Amino acid sequence: MAPANLPSIFNATSQDIEQLLAAQCHIGSKNLGVHAQPYLWKTRADGVNIINIGKTWEKIVLAARIIAAIDNPSDVCVISARPYGQRAVLKFAAHTGAQAIAGRFTPGSFTNYITRSFKEPRLIVVTDPRTDAQAIKEASYVNIPVIALCDTDSPTEYVDVAIPTNNKGRHSIGLVWWMLAREVLRLRGTIYNREAPWDVMVDLYFYRDPEAEAEEKVEEEKLPGVDEEGVAAIESGFPAAGGDWEAAPAAFPAAGAATGEWSEAQGAQWETGTGAPAADWAAEPAKESSW
């Protein structure tokens, strides 16, 4: 399945083909659109269409050459309303300098200049033509070219360059975006040697469940020995503070030696009434008010 319509410098390596197969980029859907027939390899017995990986690589290189031809990287807008592609477009934008719209696309972002999210890109790249239909529709109004990751059943209306791949799996979406970013950087000269591997791992482009990340963070923040039992948990999780717990406390000084016995009265006993006599409130006549 090696591509034959590219210069030899752009040919895919065996590792690239293995990665595309491992990420199941060749697994299409059971429905087949008329525009996806040239990219079909075969149809399995269960009705699932298999995509030609060689055609996928050709379109990845073609899309990368189009993106690299734009002088200002920020004039490229990458869009993904599908959750599996949101992390990928953010990483692609961080590595190539493009603008990213991850999540819901605000209607009017390309046509209504009054909105805060108004943009005027020269090229947009979408993850799924079906979920990103609003962005493609607005791009057609203002003559913006569209590159899209298309499955065998994806609509291709107003799509200028379709990359045939599985756009429903988290690994296939992340791998295609990773390869697209790598080819763009190679064409720009950021990666000088095409034989050397890119130092960015493809795992960074894969979707990660926020709940799973939160659970991993909680596990990392746990103190050592919390889940253990017995003396070992106390020794490992609660180290000694440095003092001796069995040491006897210091004795308080005898109060009688310094101040005398408590039973002895200093001066006179308070029971004898030596203090000032209490005034008799009843003996005093009530003062008449002038009111």
UniProtKB/Swiss-Prot annotation:
Biological process according to GO: ribosomal small subunit assembly; translation
UniProt cross-references to CDD domains, sorted A to Z: RPS2
PROSITE patterns (alphabetical): RIBOSOMAL_S2_2
Taxonomic superkingdom: Eukaryota
Span list, region Disordered: 255-291
Entry's localization field: Cytoplasm
MF annotations from Gene Ontology: structural constituent of ribosome
Keyword vocabulary terms for this entry: Cytoplasm, Ribonucleoprotein, Ribosomal protein
GO CC annotation: cytosolic small ribosomal subunit
Known role: Required for the assembly and/or stability of the 40S ribosomal subunit. Required for the processing of the 20S rRNA-precursor to mature 18S rRNA in a late step of the maturation of 40S ribosomal subunits.
Family affiliation: Belongs to the universal ribosomal protein uS2 family.
Family annotation (HAMAP family): Ribosomal_S2_euk
Subunit structure: Component of the small ribosomal subunit. Mature ribosomes consist of a small (40S) and a large (60S) subunit. The 40S subunit contains about 33 different proteins and 1 molecule of RNA (18S). The 60S subunit contains about 49 different proteins and 3 molecules of RNA (25S, 5.8S and 5S). Interacts with RPS21.
This protein's name: Small ribosomal subunit protein uS2
Encoding gene (name): RPS0
